[in-house]
Structure formats: structure tokens, C-alpha cells
Amino acid sequence: PMYVNAVTNLVNMVFNFLLIYPSRTVELLGRSFEIWGAGLGVAGAAWGTAIAFVVGFVLMVFAVCRNHLISPIGFPLKPNLEILLRVWKITLPNIMQRLVLCLGQISFTALITGLGTIPLAAHSIAITAEQAFYMPGSGFQAAATTLSGQALGAGDKDKLKKIISTAGRISVIVLTCTGFLLFLFPSVIMSVFTPDQEVIARGAEVLRLVSISEPFFGLTMVLEGAFNGMGDTKPSFYISLFTMWCLRILPAYICVKVFGLGLVAVWWCMVADVISRSMLLLARYLRGRWLKALK
């Protein structure tokens, strides 16, 4: 998957570069080069992304077929209804969670749009910058998902607990360090994306604020990954539904529409969502109800 994603992103960048902009002359090392471009604008971006996704799909299918452990070659095409029902039972809550979070993000951005151009620009850039700093947590989430599923299959309760505990602690430590960088150098980070001083100032303010939630987000990703690896996907959905809409969107709406507050207040609502989700998932883990999956 890492290699496929790398190729997909490279294809995406190349085709976006060629399809969005018109033909132009580029100066490099004192020489002029004519670079072809389709000049399609937004449509070019869509085509470039679509081509990249198709390339990624083909490469992933090829990789799956080459892997003797998961290759479908040689197996009958008749669907197994029992397996399909089990897959659907695990998948549906995860789909609903993604939908809840996606709609929540759209609603959250819509609220910020009403604050004006500068707050919206600061929000968009700060979100992009923050994503780069919590990226290590995604790796720990993938590890927790894979290893938890293996431990569950082996019926090893002690190993399962150790995997979750170890991955959770490392993720919290790493994201505490990245959060520390966000807190110390928010203006430097914002200046990488924009030269506008007002946007930098507003974005730096919220980046420093959100830095306190990074360790909690690291724990959230590991616990969600572990629960997903065990097939226990419903709790993550219910918790995300509650925290996103009751602790982020509703309070943010009240802050903006009722009290006329700005970007910082809205981001406090986001921080409350992240921390609360982490604590609720941790509470479920400590209660041990997920151990029923081993029985």
C-alpha cells in the first residue's frame, strides 16, 4: 500500500501539473523549456485525480493477485453469504462513522465560512498543517488494527492488551512531541503555506490551541484501530456521532450564531471533541467489554 500510494500521488501531481495549466515556458539552469499543458483548470484537476485513482486501483489489484496469501486467483467467484454478512456487520458502522465525520467537517467549515475570508483561510491552512503533524498517529493506528486482529485470531488476551497499551503509549508520546512543535513554532509552520501576515497570525493562534489535543488524538487513533481490528466497530461510530455533533458542531454553532464569537472559540469546540472522544474510547477500553470478542 505504501508504494501504491506513493505512485498514485506522483501520478496525481504530474497529471494535475499538465492538465490544469496551459502550455508555458519554464526557465531551469539558464535554459528555457516548453512544457505542454491542457489548460483545463478545475476540470484538469478532476481528470488528474481520476487518472491517479485508476492507476492506484490497477496497481493494488495487481499487488493483491501477486500475494499468495490473499490472491483470489483459483477461488470460485460464488459469494459466501455467511462471510458477506459478517463483513457487512463490521463494515456498516465504520461507513456510518466516516459519513458522520465527513458531514461534520463540512458543517464545521460552513460555520467558519461565515466568519470571513481571513478566518476561513487561516482555518484551512491550519488544518492542513496540523494533518502533517498527526500523520505518525495514522501509522500507529494501522499497526494497532493489524496486530490486534492477529492477537484476536490467536485468542491471546494478554498479547492483545500489550499491543494496545504499547501502541497507545508510543502514539501519545510521539504526538506529544509533534504537538510541542506546533505550540512552539506555529507562525513558522503557517508561513510555509502563506505569506499573508494576518492569516499567519490567526492560524498560529489556533495551531497553538490545537497542540494540546494532539496526544489525545494519538490515543484515539490507536484505540479506534484496535477496536476495528477486533471487529468491534459500533462503539467508535456511536462515540464519534456524539462528540462530533454534540460537542463540536452544536457548540460551534452557538458560539458563532448566538454569541458572535470567532475562530478561536470554534477551534475550542474542535479540541473538546477530540479530547472527549479519546476519553470515551479509553473508558470503554478500561471497562474491558471488548474482551467479549475473545470468547
Q: Language-model segments: what does each one mean?
A:
Residues 1, 109, 122-186, 217-240:
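Small-residue-rich hydrophobic transmembrane alpha-helices
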Residues 1-9, 45-60, 138-141, 210-229, ...:
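Short runs within selected transmembrane alpha-helices of multi-pass transporters and secretion channels
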Residues 3, 7, 93-101, 129, ...:
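Hydrophobic alpha-helical transmembrane segments of multipass membrane transporters and ion channels
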Residues 8, 52-56, 60, 64, ...:
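Transmembrane helical elements of multi-pass membrane transporters/channels
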Residues 10-18, 61, 106-110, 132, ...:
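Alpha-helical transmembrane segments of multipass membrane proteins
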Residues 15-24, 31-40, 99-132, 150, ...:
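Helix-terminus/linker motif at the lipid-water interface of multi-pass membrane proteins
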Residues 17, 49, 62, 94, ...:
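Transmembrane alpha-helix boundary and packing residues in multipass membrane permease domains
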Residues 27-92, 148-213, 255-295:
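Short alpha-helical transmembrane segments in multi-pass integral membrane proteins
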